[in-house]
Amino acid sequence: MRTNPLLGFLAALAALWLVAPATAAESEAPRLVVLGDSLSAGYGIRPEEGWVALLSRRLEKEGYGYRVVNASVSGETSGGGLARLPRVLGTHHPAVLVVELGANDGLRGLPLDELRKNLAMIVGSAQAGHAAVLLVGMRIPSNYGPEYTSGFANSFVEVSMARHTALVPFLLERVAANDANFQSDGLHPIASVQGMLLDTVWPMLKPLLHPGAAPEAARPAARR
């Protein structure tokens, strides 16, 4: 989703680090990294209200030994995420990578083969580093016609099948039908429905996790 370029740049720098300094135990914990756009960055709401922050609390409550890193940036595209990926992977070495990108590409009419190529390269690079990957899909309005709209939604399915990843077909599945679930821009969910976003992601994410994971035990073999 769109935002001020300067704010996006500053957010990109901040996104490589957690808000609070890590304890020694957290530093040893395997990382679960969310690489996303404003839908995961928590645009228009407090950081602690977003679905990624709620995920961190759920993991702690249920005994999963992961440290969540939100490397999401408002306004991000698949190309921007791909460009940032080497630093994200090099800094955090994730055991699990959640990829939530593409909405801004769709709103701008990016050619779908380019979207699929970017997503596939992100997934492949993460898998080469032995990360389990969850691809989170989106849907867009039919501004560019039904063929593009359908092809956009199917792009996530195609990449997931080709790269053998877990898939959430549509992040906003539980909230999209009700305009009251969105901020005044009609694009970004309000704070009170962020738990519904997490509940959409959780069933596909949970099988990738290891309860009480130790740093080595939490790294599944690379998927081919």
PLM region descriptions:
Residues G75-G79:
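Acidic-and-aromatic substrate-binding clefts and catalytic sites of carbohydrate-active enzymes
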Residues A14, T23, G42, E48-G50, ...:
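Residues at secondary-structure transition points
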Residues T23-S74, R84-H93:
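Serine-esterase "nucleophile elbow" of acetyl-processing enzymes
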Residues L54, Y64, L82-R224:
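Alpha-helical cap/lid subdomain in secreted, periplasmic
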Residues G8-L18:
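Bacterial N-terminal signal peptides
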Residues M1-P5:
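Positively charged n-region of N-terminal signal peptides that target proteins for export
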